[in-house]
Amino acid sequence: MDSLTLPLDYAAIERILPHRYPFLLVDRITAFEPDKRIVGIKAVTRNERYLSHQAGDAPSLPFTVLTEAVAQVGAIMILAKPENREKLIYFMGIERVRYRKPVHPGDVVEIEATVVRLRSRMGVLRGIARVGSEVVAEGTMTFALGAQGDGARPGDVRPGGRA
């Protein structure tokens, strides 16, 4: 899958990421440069289950959900590589995150993730989310790759009480 046929639609994204509705937050991938950068689209609709709404305020996409969308775009870039197809990606941390503006139903968010550092099992990505020409969120994310294997997930307690 070194050369992807763009744009990647929802079905193609489902072949790369393990996420499914309602938590698959990327609608389309429009640009892809392996190990360098990727651009994805998230169209925010009024039907999103997770829209936050305070009395008197317009509904908006929670910043945590926007952060997850950015992480998913970055994960697509990493997991699309043939050698990573059977692996899982774990985001270990986010740093220097800034939320600049709320995202509302009707907005189309363009998410760009670029590689800051990439090693065989770890890396750092920089993500920027925009609505039109305005940056709505940005930050860096550290991730690790792990093999799918015994079915254990981080934090699972095994017999004997060990994680």
Place the predicted regions along the sequence by residue.
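Compact, glycine-rich, soluble single-domain proteins
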Residues: 52-78, 91-92
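Hydrophobic beta-strand-centered segment that forms part of the acyl-chain substrate-binding groove
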Residues: 2-7, 74-112, 136-144
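Hydrophobic core residues within well-ordered beta-strands of beta-rich domains
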Residues: 23-25, 109, 123
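Short aromatic-glycine motifs in intrinsically disordered, low-complexity regions
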Residues: 8-20
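HotDog/MaoC-like acyl-thioester-processing domains
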Residues: 2-5, 18, 34, 103-105, ...
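Beta-strand-rich interaction surfaces with strong enrichment in secreted/lumenal proteins
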Residues: 14, 57, 99-101
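Catalytic strand-loop segment that frames the active site of acyl-thioester-processing enzymes
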Residues: 21-61
